[in-house]
Amino acid sequence: MGQLIDGVWHDTWYDTKSTGGKFQRSVSAFRNWLTADGTPGPSGEGGFAAEKDRYHLYVSLACPWAHRTLILRKLKGLEPFISVSVVHPLMLENGWTFDDDFPAATGDTLYQHDFLYQLYLHADPHYSGRVTVPVLWDKKNHTIVSNESAEIIRMFNTAFDALGAKAGDYYPPELRNKIDELNSWIYDNVNNGVYKAGFATSQQAYDDAVENVFTALARLEQILGQHRYLTGNRLTEADIRLWTTLVRFDPVYVTHFKCDKHRISDYLNLYGFLRDIYQLPGIAETVNFEHIRNHYFRSHKTINPTGIISIGPWQDLDEPHGRDSRFAE
């Protein structure tokens, strides 16, 4: 854990003293857009046109934000277009590292850096801010396109369609208002909500955060009792964004982040939804529980100083879910 300040690495934990013990996530700094023809997107600069083998994705298999991008890459069939490097699951005094001595960690396959912060300095020698994954990298211009997962998945959704990406629109125009509304409260109360609970340093901050987590889960349980996915019977980015948190909830967040009022496996609809998406073609291979559990339990020394990995609980995600037949059109 740490950050760069004017190009110099500092090993620092999150500052919660000035916020009453509340965890506040910083805003992603690189917000350019990869588009079909290189025209500028909603933010940042233009010039990032979709091309085969021009872009590279840096991810952690532990990270729910990076996991979103791996799923869209899989669903859209972008493996031939976008290569990947996987960091080591442990994030300690030097942040994310490129050690390759853990199964499925690849090292930095482009520049052979030791640490992810060196890649950020490659793009901006005076960068100040957190060093996070995912990172969408432009191999042509040797710079970061984006480190905002919510925007990277939208780039992947459409940018390569004319070059042979798989069919499928996970942010369809007719559902965008509904998706945006879902994304907003799910991000605040579930995706980031578990971190607010886990990284809280006051009882009140924890109590407020964990109450919001389970209020939101109850709301989601109700929604998913009405149709197969969040917006109906069509898989969208809203489902993927929720799912990468749910798949980590019982193995990690219940114990490590003290989100232990209920497990996802206690909810009929949420647990079915979790298994449903896990069993979609290609999704299971994006999940690595060894990276997930080793990262959280062994990296966050502030909240788990011994680094002991808890025993569970575990789930059988291959168990039939029945949601396809239950909500058959």
Pin down the residues of each PLM region.
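C-terminal alpha-helical interaction module
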Residues: 1-329
